[in-house]
Amino acid sequence: MKRTTYIIFGMLLTGLVVVCAGIFYASTQVTGWDNIFLDIKGEKKTVQLPQCRVIQMVAVRNIIATGEGEEKGIRMPAFGELPLKITSGEAGQGSFTYASGMDEFMTMNSVGDTLRIVFDFPNDKLEKKYQDLYWLNLRSEEMIIALPDHVQFLQTSLEAQKMTVEGLARDSLSLMVQDYATINDCNFRALTVQNGAWLFNTGKADNLHLHLNGIRSWNVNANSFHVDTEYLYAHGDQRCTLEKGECRQVVWMPQSEGASLDIKLKEAATVVVK
């Protein structure tokens, strides 16, 4: 074997050793999959909701600090593995069901006609392995709100949470979500939605009010969800697609001077300008 060949072989072997060492080191630094999640356990607990017209669900974003007390980031609680179901309250009474372990991280308080459900995960309530995570993934059983008739507006700003609304029959209701929402087997005379991504799966809404600023997407299952009139609200320039069979008519409701809507139609339609 020539000397040059020995040199090349040695360089390749050295490189392989370095790569293997790097992979081993990285594997010791990565948090295990099970450690990514904060599991919140306990028996199911149901509490009665106080009289209110508005329910807000929010999560505190705590500061992550260095050992010297300097701020190095913000911890974001993520509810991707902690879904929320909204059902109808019985006899006008509302309730909230959740895993009892959540009591350590949750408070409920009323201000005027608004009930605030606040989730907070400060360092003094977390094990060391969670304290430096910028993205705190939560995992627990489904939370359920039995919504009483007197609640007119439900707002949830919980990151990555999937909300399902099932079996509601209401004259009117307003809903705002942070991420994902599905409507199943509901009947509304008027439904207003804001933010997030929406699937109108089964049921009907005679009047569907969509605030386009903040809504990432919406999809109406025309085979099983009926909409008579869609009202589209927006500031600035907006565009959307009206799918075949999505609704009977659309009403454009500009919210600022110069607001415009670029709408793509998937079936024959009549445009009436007032």
Q: Can you say where each PLM-predicted feature lies in the sequence?
A:
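Eukaryotic acidic, serine/threonine-rich low-complexity intrinsically disordered regions
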Residues: 183-187, 192, 196, 202-204
